[in-house]
Amino acid sequence: MYIHTTNTNQINMKNLFYLVVIFFISCGPQQNKNQEELPGRLGNENLALKNDKRLNPQLLSALSEFGLDSIAPPPPVSVLSSVEDRLQFIAAAEPLYRGLFASIYQSIDLPNNVINETRIIKDEDGNEIKLYISRPKNISGKLPSVLHIHGGGMAILTANDPNYIHWRQSLAAKNLIVVGVEFRNIGGVLGNNPFPAGLNDCINALKWIHQNKEELGISKIIVSGESGGGNLTIATALK
């Protein structure tokens, strides 16, 4: 009985060894293949935008004019930098972004079938929140609404920048009521407003839209944002 058990264990160990070898042989090349097939910088961390074959050639041409087709140098600040250094970096970077967007959008016409207005609401602490509202002309009945939260890392840019004005009005031209919220950034031209000031502004804007759905002629509300605005969109929904 002892000899039989030992032989069985030896056979089982041998089979296990073969299975492990077969596993690594079969999976190894496939893993390398999958790694090579990953798109963009997931597959090549040193891939420059100009070498990404997925990019629209017209977009590449536009970005190349501003030197945005190559790998950007690392920023001079990090999470380890002082608050003062980070705020100085934000203050220096913001005009560059705003100038870029102004240059791009100065030759792009805005829709001519949109009505725009600005409203100022107040939160429970008396803080004023500016809302930019765009709606289509000559449309009756209730319409879906989009609360748009702009990008900028929650640190720079404003809802009144030309790229965001164009985006909101383009959506409104497609029969949506679009509200852009001027939330407080943590730096830049809108000042140093520590978190969660900006998030609270977004939440109060959403509450105001919901409370005034009848007056505004709104059927449903969608919250949308990109980049830092996408972060605030998720946070607004969660809170």
Residue ranges and their predicted role:
Residues 145, 175-182:
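A fold-wide structural signal in alpha/beta-hydrolase
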Residues 159, 163-170, 179-220:
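Catalytic nucleophile-loop/oxyanion-hole region of alpha/beta-hydrolase
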Residues 93-141:
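N-terminal cap/lid segment of alpha/beta-hydrolase-fold proteins
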